[in-house]
Every structure is written in C-alpha cells, then in structure tokens.
Amino acid sequence: MNNLVNVEMAGINDIDALVKMRLEYLIEDNGNLNDSEVIEIKRELPNYFKKHISNDLFIFVVREEQTIVACAFLLVIEKPMSPAFINGKTGTVLNVYTCPDYRHKGYARLIMETLLEEAKKLQLSVVDLKSTDDGYYLYKSVGFADDNSKYHLMKWKPDTLVQK
C-alpha cells in the first residue's frame, strides 16, 4: 500500500462522484439495475447526500490523482437507549467499495480503520454492518464480530411505494 494515501471525509463537492460510486457498488452487489432504478437513484441520491453528509452520514474516501477510488459510509442513528446501545447512538456501515482497478492496495482496511476511529470520537455505542463473504475477514480483522443474537433479522417492504 502507498503510505502517502490519506483517508478524507467527503463533502458536498464530491456528490457527483459519490453517486457514481454508489451506483457502481449497487450494480456489483445486486447485478444490473433496471433503467427506472438508475434514473430514480440519480435523481434522488444527490438530494439525500446534500441533506445528510456531515450531519448523520459520514463518507470516508481515498483519492488517487483527485479521483475517488474507494469509499465507505457511516450512517449515525440515535435510538432510545438500551443496554445494547447505552447512549442510544449507533452506526451502520454501508457501501464499502473500492473500484476494481484499485483493489488489493489496502484502501478498504485504511478506510475502515479511519471510520472506526471516527465512530469512537462520535461516541457510538455500537457499529454494525452486513458483510459479503469477500469482506468478512477484513471486517473481523478490524474488530467486528458475528452478531449472535436471540433476535431474528427481519424486514418489511410495502407492495408498492407511494411516489412523491
């Protein structure tokens, strides 16, 4: 890994590049998106970023020659306190992604280490993520553990979304 590489916090000026990175991540993770999904994401995601970056969404990036080549998102959520998150502040890691030509340089590890240092500064009680098989050992190596809970991970989705 290049020792001159720095992890930076992305800002409003990075939104176009972040939308591109998010789409690349989603396509790699989910397979091709349909045209209407791409259009919706390109239309709505910039507004989401404008509203949330540096408020409750912290995006860590690595650049090579001014181009973002790796990123990870830390979404901070405040919940009613419980023994599992005693101060109510939790984080969720999303969108850990390195462009294919820049993989195996240690960028994801560097970003995750920086992200977790920020989580400590933000006094998050716990940080969670969903891992692919490819990322599992990286996350274990920076301190994540399997969540052996008595609870089942479940979700609900409406049949259709109400359009704005």
Model-based region annotation:
Residues 6-20:
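A short beta-loop-alpha structural element at the N-terminal edge
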Residues 112, 119-131:
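Conserved GNAT acetyl-CoA-binding A-motif
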Residues 61, 67-76, 92, 97:
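Conserved beta-strand in the GNAT
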Residues 47-61:
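A short helix-loop-beta-strand connector motif used in the catalytic cores of GNAT acetyltransferases and
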Residues 26-48:
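Conserved GNAT-fold acetyl-CoA-binding loop/helix
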Residues 78-93, 103, 149-150:
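A conserved beta-turn-beta hairpin within the catalytic core of GNAT-like acetyltransferases
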Residues 76-82, 128-130, 140, 145-160:
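Conserved catalytic-core motifs of GNAT/GCN5-like acyltransferases
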Residues 102-114:
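Conserved acetyl-CoA pyrophosphate-binding loop and the N-cap/start of the following alpha-helix
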